């Protein structure tokens, strides 16, 4: 079976389906997210990542922003919704919910890697703000965990400001701008 976004939605555990449905109402900061809702953002990210043929990436795409509505606050400076801690909340959802873990496995992915990609997807976008020593240490840690390459693909797919190009991931990295 070839994975598709709709297949993943249709086979998702009820908790994931409910969160996805609720995310159709969350409009994020338009200068970073021109898409109409977080649900649409997730759909775009998943469709980009499905091109890689890597189920870990497809499942991380489905789950990386799944808890945004649970963590949403209005940013005091710009007035747009922000969701601090949504990465940790997604990690917790995966690691603490057996039916989510089973769904990940049923789709050929590794729940530990999917959880780690979700946990670190925001930190990945902050690499450019780190001192070189700290950045290299973080990359080494992710390499040892077997997720560094996956984070690069995920980071590129998660960037809505440029077209996703699997053959030129660097152009998508926010920390290169």
Feature roles, as predicted:
Residues 3-7, 15, 19-22, 113, ...:
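Exposed alpha-helical structural elements
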């Amino acid at each position: 079976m070839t994975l598709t976004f709709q297949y993943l939605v249709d086979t998702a555990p009820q908790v994931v389906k409910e969160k996805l449905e609720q995310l159709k109402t969350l409009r994020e900061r338009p200068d970073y997210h021109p898409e109409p809702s977080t649900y649409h953002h997730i759909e775009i990210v998943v469709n980009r990542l499905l091109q890689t043929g890597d189920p870990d990436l497809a499942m991380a795409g489905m789950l990386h922003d799944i808890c945004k509505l649970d963590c949403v606050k209005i940013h005091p400076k710009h007035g747009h919704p922000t969701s601090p801690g949504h990465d940790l909340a997604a990690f917790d959802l995966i690691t603490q919910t057996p039916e989510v873990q089973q769904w990940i496995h049923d789709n050929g992915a590794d729940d530990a890697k999917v959880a780690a990609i979700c946990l670190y997807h925001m930190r990945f976008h902050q690499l450019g703000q780190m001192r070189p020593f700290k950045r290299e240490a973080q990359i080494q840690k992710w390499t040892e965990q077997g997720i560094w390459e996956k984070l690069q693909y995920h980071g590129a797919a998660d960037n809505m400001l440029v077209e996703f190009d699997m053959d030129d991931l660097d152009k998508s990295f926010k920390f290169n701008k």
